[in-house]
């Protein structure tokens, strides 16, 4: 608890007054009257400052950010539960493992470099990848369906299958995926290792929302803009802010990935958006869950809004016991869904529920994998 103690205003004030470590510890272990956070209303109580630090450890934190695809304007931003008690921005500064929300970047590179399509089939078997030191990395897989069968990329992403992501990473390279992530606005340090395909990198929610926003922006990364302009008291514009833009991928790949990620919502890990929250308009997205169920993610996209949610405790050692509740579909997706319900119900926003527009080139790709595979079987027969 020492690091948390040193980060408090109380500790810094005592240190500035010349207290030594022993004196500071004595103050922190002496009960005093204080007001602490609770989900209903703040509670007036008596406890030691050290006990209050331990008390706050058990609260889940969450962050949310939403932005417009083409303008980059940030429309909603929640850095934590209550800034009076949790003075840390979980959106901009908290870099956490991203889990399966990183998989779309791997799929994007596989489509760009290797020509994969949503209905391309890969055998669902455990891949083995030789590492630089000669050891073998063979990832585990929580998904036990269709082992040994041929599965489509659309199915694999919808069900967040680890083996297929690792198979794709084996065909491309970690560095090529990192290069793509950089074009999509990710600046956090990333190690070029095969396990990157499962989301071992630690990245902020702000970066991830900005990166996902590339897909509904026709492959163009648009830097998130928090302030559009600055005016003086007379209304004179002192500064205008225009987002930086980078062509991260071609429009056709972006559209293909959007449609592939719609499968996550229509019949994969995010299907509860439809049946539990009645969000039946076109939505593409991806859940993410990290080791020991410490972090839950969901990033969802519509043609007019990209929003992401992260949920977890301040320290990874505090987490859910099992994946029953310790997964992105339970930890983060409900927040996203309730937020979007409010957006659609607000007449002042008047958010349309249109489908994602097709590329201007007229490009289209088949997403009805059952029909495509039937046609393939007939041709072979």
What do these predicted ranges mean?
Residues 1-68, 77, 83-91, 102, ...:
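A penicillin-recognizing enzyme superfamily signal
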Residues 116-177, 221, 233-258, 262:
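Conserved catalytic neighborhood of penicillin-recognizing serine enzymes
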Residues 59-61, 151, 193:
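Short coil/loop residues immediately preceding or within conserved phosphate-binding loops
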Residues 136-141, 172-210, 219, 223-226:
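Mid-domain, small-residue-enriched loop/turn segments at the edges of structured enzyme/sensor domains
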Residues 89, 93-133, 267, 341:
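Active-site rim segments in enzyme catalytic domains, especially the processed small/beta chain
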Residues 93, 163-165, 193-195:
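Short, solvent-exposed beta-strand edge segments and adjacent coil->beta transition regions
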């Amino acid at each position: 608890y020492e690091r948390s103690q040193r980060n408090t205003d109380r500790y810094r004030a005592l240190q500035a007054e010349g207290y030594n470590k022993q004196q500071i510890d004595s103050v922190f272990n002496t009960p005093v009257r204080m007001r602490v956070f609770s989900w209903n209303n703040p509670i007036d109580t008596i406890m030691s400052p050290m006990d209050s630090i331990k008390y706050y450890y058990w609260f889940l934190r969450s962050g949310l950010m939403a932005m417009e695809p083409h303008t980059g304007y940030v429309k909603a931003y929640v850095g934590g539960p209550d800034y009076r008690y949790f003075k840390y921005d979980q959106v901009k500064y908290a870099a956490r493992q991203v889990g399966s929300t990183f998989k779309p970047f791997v799929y994007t590179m596989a489509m760009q470099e290797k020509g994969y399509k949503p209905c391309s089939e890969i055998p669902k078997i455990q891949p083995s990848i030789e590492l630089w030191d000669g050891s073998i990395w063979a990832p585990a897989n929580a998904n036990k369906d269709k082992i040994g069968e041929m599965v489509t990329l659309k199915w694999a992403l919808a069900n967040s299958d680890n083996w297929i992501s690792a198979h794709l990473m084996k065909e491309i390279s970690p560095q090529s995926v990192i290069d793509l992530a950089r074009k999509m606005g990710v600046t956090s340090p990333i190690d070029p290792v095969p396990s990157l395909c499962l989301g071992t990198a630690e990245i902020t929610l702000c970066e991830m929302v900005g990166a996902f926003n590339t897909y509904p922006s026709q492959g163009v990364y648009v830097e998130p803009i928090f302030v559009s302009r600055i005016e003086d008291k007379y209304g004179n514009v002192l500064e205008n802010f225009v987002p930086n833009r980078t062509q991260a991928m071609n429009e056709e790949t972006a559209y293909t990935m959007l449609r592939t990620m719609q499968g996550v919502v229509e019949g994969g890990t995010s299907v509860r958006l439809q049946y539990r929250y009645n969000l039946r308009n076109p939505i593409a997205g991806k859940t993410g869950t990290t080791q020991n169920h410490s972090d839950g993610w969901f990033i969802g996209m519509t043609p007019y809004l990209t929003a992401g949610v992260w949920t977890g405790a301040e320290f990874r050692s505090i987490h859910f016991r099992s994946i029953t509740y310790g997964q992105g579909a339970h930890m983060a997706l409900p927040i996203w869904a309730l937020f979007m319900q409010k957006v659609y119900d607000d007449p002042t926003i008047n958010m349309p529920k249109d489908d994602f527009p097709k590329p201007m080139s007229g490009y289209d790709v088949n997403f009805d994998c059952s029909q495509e595979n039937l046609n393939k079987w007939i041709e072979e027969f």
